[in-house]
Amino acid sequence: MLLHRMLRTVMVVAVALAAGLVGTVGGGTSTARAEEGKPSQGRQLLFYNHAYGVLDRETADAIEHSAYLREFANFQVRTTTGSGGQTWTGRYLMGRETYLELFGVGDLPGQDGTFGSAGMGVSTERAGDRATVMERLRALGVTEPIEYRQTRDFGDGVPVPWFDAVFTTDQYDSFGAWGMEYRPEYFADPRSKTEPPDYPGDVGRERYLPDDYRDHEMRDVTSVRLAASARDVANTVPMLRAGGFAVRDAGDGAVATRGGVTIRLDAAPRDRAGLKQVTFALNEPAGNRHKERIGRSTLVVGPGLGAVWNFDAPK
């Protein structure tokens, strides 16, 4: 996902809103910090959807051409056209409800294409819950959340509404997170290859993702660990709390848990930022431990129902 492009579009459309938000985000962060020891209120509205990371070129290329990953997961290399004709080509590992999106240095334009850049989407399962998230954000001190609609072009030049996003701020160093809710127009388009709803108002992740995960080992992402600036971490905490995650301090960073996924954000300088680790649940227990070196990363699968993927910084 092109985080910089999304936020730049928002700034062009709503410059006054963005300018007014700079002072309010700090207040929201302070409120979130003060309440981190308390349990989240109400039902969970936002769930881990996906994270992306920009890796060194060696690792990105090794991932793209890995025969093992094509066995391990529902793996795709895909180019997507979004709002305003912006395009991105990513490497995707897709599970039942969650997925991982990986890029190499230079795959994305500008700031987003540098090593260590990363992002994360957390999404609703029921139509209308994004509005409640925005109410909770305002209660946390983010008085003017930034809204954005992403579209998708399936190749005919006609943009189809894809999802509505909300951000706490338009300012970030290397990492940003957004809340999102898939649009009914996207599910209604047969080219999206999505599933019928399981209940009225179903805009969930399982409906959005294909069922091809059943033919592979990987079932879902169970945790992600990313490093980002203290400012980026602080700006993410209100979104997680508004979504219903249980958030606690972890040194200079934060850990959020709920909905079967743990999100760890470590505060770090820019040269140490980026995607650090992802863990997965498997469809069936792996009888033996398998270690796969992929570029400057190491994926360990099994024994049992889990896998761990660690990403090293380039030398």
Model regions and ranges:
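Secretory targeting and sorting signals
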Residues: 1-34
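N-terminal beta-strand motif that seeds the catalytic metal site of vicinal oxygen chelate
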Residues: 37-63, 186-233, 278
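An N-terminus-focused feature that recognizes amino-terminal "leader" regions
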Residues: 37-109, 114-117
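Vicinal oxygen chelate
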Residues: 48-59, 81, 93, 110-231, 243, 270-295, ...
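Amphipathic alpha-helical segments
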Residues: 60-76, 133-139, 230-247
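Phosphate-end processing signature that detects enzymes handling 5′-triphosphorylated RNA
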Residues: 65-68, 72-73, 124, 128-131, ...
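Polyanion-binding and phosphate-handling cores
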Residues: 70, 89, 99-169
